[in-house]
Every structure is written in structure tokens, then in C-alpha cells.
Design a protein with these regions (language model features):
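HhH-family (HhH-GPD) DNA N-glycosylase catalytic core used in base-excision repair
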Residues: 1-59
Length: 59
């Protein structure tokens, strides 16, 4: 589900230094469309920030 993918993507940021490249997040889930929806919704919801090819936790 999209919710599952959102959780996996956030886990990558939480388990690291709070930032990850788009390529690193691409490795989390094989379905590019579903992963893209999840990333977009996380950014729209303010739970993730995108700067260039990197994503990070807000703040």
C-alpha cells in the first residue's frame, strides 16, 4: 500500500542522518509509480523536504 511505502521511505531518513538521495530512496520500493506517489504525498504533507536530488526530514 502507499502507506507502507511512505513508512519505508521515512524509515530511511530516520535511520540515517535525516537525509537521503533520491537514488537511495529509489532502492526502497521497486514500483516507481507507487514510490513517486508516496514521496509526493510526504512532501505535500510536510513530513519530508526535497532539495535538488535529496530528501530530508523537515527542520
Amino acid at each position: 500500500t502507499d502507506r507502507q511505502v511512505r513508512g519505508l521511505l521515512l524509515d530511511v531518513l530516520r535511520d540515517g542522518d535525516g537525509t537521503a538521495t533520491a537514488a537511495r530512496l529509489d532502492a526502497v520500493w521497486p514500483d516507481a509509480l507507487q514510490r513517486g506517489r508516496a514521496l509526493a504525498s510526504l512532501v505535500d504533507d510536510g513530513l519530508m523536504v526535497r532539495v535538488g536530488d535529496r530528501y530530508s526530514l523537515p527542520g
